[in-house]
Amino acid sequence: LPTPNDDKLLRMDGWPGGVNNRIRETEQASDRGTDSIPNSAFLRRALNVDLTTEGHPLRRRGYALAQAGYAHSVFNGNGLFFVVIDGALMVGPKSSELVQVATVNKYLRMSYTTHAGAVYYSNGVDSGRYTTTLEVWPGPDQEYDIHTDEDLELADNLYETMPIGHVIASNNGRMWVGTRDTLWFSEGMSPHICRRSTNYFMLPSYPYMLQPSGDGMYIGTETGISFLKGADPFTAELEGAYSYGIVPFAFTRVPGRRFEVEEDDVPVWWTRDGVMSVGLPSGEVRQLTRDRLAAPEYGFGAMSLREREGISQVVSSLQKGGDANNMGASDSVVAEIRRC
């Protein structure tokens, strides 16, 4: 489309089928009986184009620089915006009002989770908890002797500080930490301590994603997606949910109502077979894009839920190692139309 204005975009018939790059080039397009440009239900490719529910195109406004620097690991939690910029963990009410709260590794991806009104963060080396003031967590290793009254007999249990991991999550009153091929979980309602002799699961490979869904949790590794089914980790079952590995860091959460479930939000992610999926509370993984969008294998990525001007959509940025990111395009509109 040669630089159309917004009025021209809105007057088009639109593409009610959305973006679809899996349709055959020879597929017969329906005659809509109009002289408007679209003569197919599908767009094959779109750059900075939003589509309404009816398929009408809108111009996406591109991007604007908020703050210069090597930035990654963006997170929004408890009404605050978190990001790592040039080795500084920055926090603020929005991207234009940030203050530094910690010095962290410049390159390691940061994982975040909210728990009991605080935001916890960890990258495998640096970790902490942010409330109104910064508190170190989990800190130096310590041991705790805790006594419990069970049947009038005192039992000594050795508790230790939770390990520092590269990925963390909070679910069912416990903190979960992923380190290499091990998934650790804290004591109930005690997110800083665990029994390292019992409070863990062994994983088949390096975990990149921990995402709660209902009483369970999805675990994404290099080789597949697993679902930990059950609220009590001591009786929970670890089941295989999807046979392809997660694209590292390419996951986010969306409102559960979009998938007719009662959860406030559920996880969505990209896997290495080029498919976006949602993890439902039952442990079912539902593919969202396989029948209409084919994506090549990517090395890493990022996702975010974008809600603007009445449109709610998941925005993904996917890259191969060393490839330039073409998701941040300038203010332009490009659409590829198949004519028959």
Could you tell me what each predicted segment is?
Residues 1-97, 143-232, 317-339:
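N-terminal beta-propeller domains
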Residues 66-75, 103-117, 149-170, 204-212, ...:
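Repeated scaffold domains used in trafficking and secretory/extracellular systems
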Residues 80-81, 117-119, 312-315:
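Hydrophobic beta-strand segments of well-ordered beta-sheets in folded domains
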Residues 83-84, 89-122:
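Pre-catalytic or accessory/regulatory segments outside the catalytic core
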Residues 85, 92-95, 123-125, 130-133, ...:
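Short acidic-glycine loop/turn motifs at beta-strand connectors
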Residues 98-103, 137-150, 194-199, 236-242, ...:
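Beta-propeller fold detector
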Residues 111-149:
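Hydrophobic or amphipathic alpha-helical targeting/insertion segments
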